């Protein structure tokens, strides 16, 4: 069983069909032909301020990031670690709202990257699901990562994303049952996000074998593309994960470059962008040469 553009209810009944191509799916098709994984990088929009965040997204793409996961800052980020929470807090203090994030989507698309948004579902729901899908598509968006939305409760989003040709990226974890993996694979579009462990995000000193097993189980459940988010912070770690995953997702290590040494305030923008470019290149080298 493979992932198609056909959405279903959690029980497997067809819900709708999108005839628009998957932008992230096209990226994976290209990279599989080249036998290399994709590099997906995360930064919250509005951090350290709106203008610099746009420069940061462009810098990432120019220095090796293939798809940019644009985070929507949220006041209660239960799954984010201290580094991302600090960045999101700065962005929220800048008054960032969901309306303005589409400017970041356009920036990534114009730079040649694949624009993704990561958002807690409450933000999308209150903005309006259909309105969000329409505005996201019009800005050139590819797909939405929803860490707290499961397929069983995603009927409205599945229908809206089909109408607008947007990818649905659901999460799985090592604790996910086979039934849950199958439900996610059946309803996902673009790729499945394999969270290496449940709990908050953050950089890891070492990486064990559990993510590789999760990728294998998720593929067996029917997912065509599986990307891993595990706290990768070095080129060596990126290469290790990239040897078996279709994509490597990096967040905290990139956010860290724009934070000051106290991990609470923003670094000087010029210095931060320079560090971000260097870190992006370092990770891209490891990830893209993993095989």
Swiss-Prot record:
It comes from the Bacteria. Signal peptide: none annotated. It holds the Pfam family Trp_syntA. GO terms for cellular component: cytosol. It is an enzyme of class 4 (lyase). It catalyses: (1S,2R)-1-C-(indol-3-yl)glycerol 3-phosphate + L-serine = D-glyceraldehyde 3-phosphate + L-tryptophan + H2O. The keyword Amino-acid biosynthesis applies. Gene3D superfamilies: Aldolase class I. The keyword Ribosomal protein does not apply. Its EC number is 4.2.1.20. The active site is at 69 (proton acceptor), 80 (proton acceptor). Keywords: Amino-acid biosynthesis, Aromatic amino acid biosynthesis, Lyase, Tryptophan biosynthesis. GO terms for molecular function: tryptophan synthase activity. Belongs to the TrpA family. Tetramer of two alpha and two beta chains. The alpha subunit is responsible for the aldol cleavage of indoleglycerol phosphate to indole and glyceraldehyde 3-phosphate. This is Tryptophan synthase alpha chain. The lineage of its organism: Bacteria, Bacillati, Actinomycetota, Actinomycetes, Bifidobacteriales.
